[in-house]
Amino acid sequence: LEKLKPLFYQTFEKYCNDRNYMNLCWDEVIKNYSNKKRFYHNLNHLQHMFNELQEVEDFIESIDSVRLAVFYHDLIYKVTSTENEEQSSEAFEKRISKTRFEHVDLVKEMIIATKFHDKTLNSDSRYFLDSDLAVLGSSSSQYDEYTRLIRKEYQIYPTFLYRRGRLKVLRALLNKPIYQTDYFTSKYEKQAQRNLKRELQTLV
C-alpha cells in the first residue's frame, strides 16, 4: 500500500484537481481489491505488476495509461461472472470521465484485452498484458502458491468443475506464445511453459 497509494495519486493528480474526487477513486480501488474473497487478484497482484513494469518503463510510451490499466483491470472481479473485464472497463470510464485524461479508449482496450490475452498491435498494451502474466514464469514454488490462491478464489466450485475450467485456461495459454514482448519472452517464457505443463499434468 505504501507504494501503490502515492503512485495512484501521482498519476491521477495530473488530470484532476479535485482531491476529494481522487480520494473517492482511491477508496474504491482499495475497497474492491481488499475484498476478503480475493486471494490472488488483490493489491499484491497490482504491486507485482508494477514491480515488473518498472524494468521496462523506458520502452513504454504512455506510462500513465499503463498505470491506470493496472489499477482498474481487476476492479470488478467475481468468479461467477464472465463480464468482469467489461465491467472493470466501464467502471474505469465512469471514474476517469470526470478528469482531463484523454487516452480513455486505449486503457479500456487494455483492460478488456486481459480477458483472452490475445496478440495486440499496441506496444504499451503488450507490456501491460505481459506484466499481468508474469506470475506464470515465476519459480516452481511461487507458481504453486499462485495456483493455490486461484483455487481458493474458485472454492465455490467442486473439484471436477474447477479442473475442467482450469484445463481450458491452461490449454489456451499453451496454444500460443504466452508473452508478446521480447523482454518478458526472454525472461519468463521457458519457465512459464514448464509451470503450465506441470500443472496440466496434475489435472488430466
Label for each model-derived stretch:
Residues 3-15, 19-26:
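Hydrophobic, proline/glycine-rich low-complexity stretches
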Residues 35-48, 77-90:
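Active-site metal-coordination segments of metallo-dependent hydrolases
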Residues 41, 60-67, 80-84, 99-103:
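Short, surface-exposed helix-loop/turn micro-motifs enriched in polar/charged residues
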Residues 49, 63-79, 88, 110-115:
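His-Asp-centered metal-binding catalytic motifs of divalent-metal-dependent phosphohydrolases/nucleases
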Residues 88-120:
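Histidine- and acidic-residue-rich, metal-dependent catalytic cores
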